[in-house]
């Protein structure tokens, strides 16, 4: 093999190839599971109700189904490669070699015995030999092997179709789930990061769709090639048997001692067929291994790029959110500062603004939130004293002067900056004017 210093037999190369393919497939499936976990870990705890229905999409259930499916597929692939690695090719080749040797030995003995028999006896014996060969255990085993191979291929095909169909259904459900989350929780007015999210979402969904299409195409090609190979091998075996039959009839008419030459020709033809079948099988295995490795490397690279882009977009969204929050808090603080400056003259005695604190001193007795505020007891006491002073000075209740003086007293008490004596003096001045 180019690039390798040592020489390997066909069986060793087969074992090395299957072991490498098994490890690569195992690593690929493990990485796929890790990337899926990292991709949807943020939404695994969310629940989305489908509009106009009572259906609830739970991310946890979708994740569990995908994980179970990947584990089952991984176990099936591992068991398949273990079964292929445990195949006893050396024993089977030895048994085939023994069968061929016995066959040629019997053919040689038969050729030697033909010299003492006439044409009719030889013809009857050859017909009986052909019937015995077709009814022998080896012929039954060969037919049984072909039927079993076709049966196994059909089972593998049905299982793969069901698995791919289930994976496609789960993928479509995941796509609907992600779109429902986006429509419910993402604000479409925030154009900057929503566009980035749409791009990442389209790339991830496109990657998953390409993965499914690649698996379906690869499966169809592999199943078709394997089925064609089995059919071709079966036809070649049948053709070989028919050729042997014709050669046996040729040996019947051989009266010049050319039987040994015919036997050698048949042996060479059988060995050539065996070498051809081995070369075809090795070439198919190497070709499919290269295709699988190339596809897995391509998928791994795309997943790595998508993960990096997703992480960068997530970081950018987090930074943008923090920045927007800081801007909003600064706006609130500036609004309070402006409010303080605009109302400094009128409400400054009641409001105090500090960093992170807003204090309002209400000049009323307000014990409960569900009650209207009442004036303080001191303000009520001052109001009673001032009203009594008005009565003593001869101001009659219900008159216009009484109403004007009551309004003036309320204005004086509302300022909360004048003492009781100052208010009395102001009332006396007002009475004189």
Curated annotation (Swiss-Prot):
Subcellular localization: Cytoplasm; Secreted; Lipid droplet
GO cellular component, as recorded: chylomicron; cytoplasm; lipid droplet; low-density lipoprotein particle; very-low-density lipoprotein particle
Main location: cytoplasm
Glycosylation sites per record: 158
Pfam families named among the record's database cross-references: ApoB100_C
Biological processes, Gene Ontology terms: cholesterol metabolic process; lipid transport
Molecular function in Gene Ontology: heparin binding
Disulfide bonds listed in the record: none
Stored InterPro entries: ApoB100_C, Apolipoprotein_B
Induction text: Within 24 hours after estradiol administration, APOB mRNA is increased five- to seven-fold in liver but is unchanged in intestine and kidney.
Record key words, sorted: Cholesterol metabolism, Chylomicron, Cytoplasm, Glycoprotein, Heparin-binding, LDL, Lipid droplet, Lipid metabolism, Lipid transport, Secreted, Steroid metabolism, Sterol metabolism, Transport, VLDL
Organism superkingdom: Eukaryota
Protein's job: Apolipoprotein B is a major protein constituent of chylomicrons, VLDL and LDL. It functions as a recognition signal for the cellular binding and internalization of LDL particles by the apoB/E receptor.
Name assigned to this protein: Apolipoprotein B
């Amino acid at each position: 093999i180019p690039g390798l210093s040592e020489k390997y037999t066909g069986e060793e190369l087969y074992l090395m190839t299957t072991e490498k393919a098994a490890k690569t497939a195992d690593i690929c499936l493990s990485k796929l599971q890790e990337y899926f976990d990292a991709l949807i870990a943020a939404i695994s705890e969310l629940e989305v109700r489908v509009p106009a229905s009572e259906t609830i999409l739970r991310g946890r259930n979708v994740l569990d189904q995908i994980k179970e499916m990947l584990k089952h597929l991984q176990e099936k692939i591992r068991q398949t490669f273990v079964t292929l690695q445990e195949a006893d090719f050396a024993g089977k080749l030895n048994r085939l070699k023994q069968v061929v040797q016995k066959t040629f030995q019997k053919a040689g003995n038969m050729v030697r015995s033909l010299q003492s028999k006439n044409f009719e006896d030889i013809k009857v014996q050859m017909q009986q030999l052909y019937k015995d060969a077709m009814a022998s255990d080896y012929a039954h085993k060969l037919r049984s092997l072909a039927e079993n191979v076709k049966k196994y291929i059909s089972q593998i095909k049905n299982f793969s179709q069901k698995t791919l169909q289930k994976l496609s259904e789960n993928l479509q459900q995941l796509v609907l789930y992600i779109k429902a989350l986006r429509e419910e929780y993402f604000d479409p007015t925030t154009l900057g990061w929503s566009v980035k999210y749409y791009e990442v979402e389209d790339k991830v969904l496109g990657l998953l769709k390409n993965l499914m299409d690649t698996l379906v195409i690869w499966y169809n090609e592999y199943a078709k090639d394997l089925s064609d190979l089995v059919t071709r091998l079966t036809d070649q075996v049948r053709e070989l048997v028919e050729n042997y039959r014709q050669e046996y009839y040729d040996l019947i008419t051989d009266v010049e001692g050319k039987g040994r030459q015919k036997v050698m020709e048949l042996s060479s033809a059988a060995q050539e067929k065996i070498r051809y079948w081995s070369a075809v099988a090795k070439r198919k295995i190497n070709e499919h291994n290269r295709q699988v490795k190339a596809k897995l490397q391509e998928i791994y690279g795309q997943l790595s790029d998508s993960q990096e882009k997703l992480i960068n977009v997530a970081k950018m969204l987090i930074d943008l959110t923090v920045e927007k929050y800081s801007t909003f808090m600064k706006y609130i603080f500036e609004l309070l500062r402006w409010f303080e400056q605009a109302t400094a003259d009128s409400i400054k005695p009641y409001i105090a603004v500090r960093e992170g604190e807003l204090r309002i001193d209400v000049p009323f007795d307000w014990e409960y939130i569900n009650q209207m505020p009442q004036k303080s007891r001191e303000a009520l006491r001052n109001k009673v004293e001032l009203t009594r002073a008005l009565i003593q000075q001869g101001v009659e209740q219900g008159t216009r002067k009484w109403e004007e003086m009551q309004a003036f007293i309320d204005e004086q008490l509302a300022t909360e900056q004048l003492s009781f004596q100052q208010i009395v003096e102001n009332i006396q001045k007002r009475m004189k004017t």
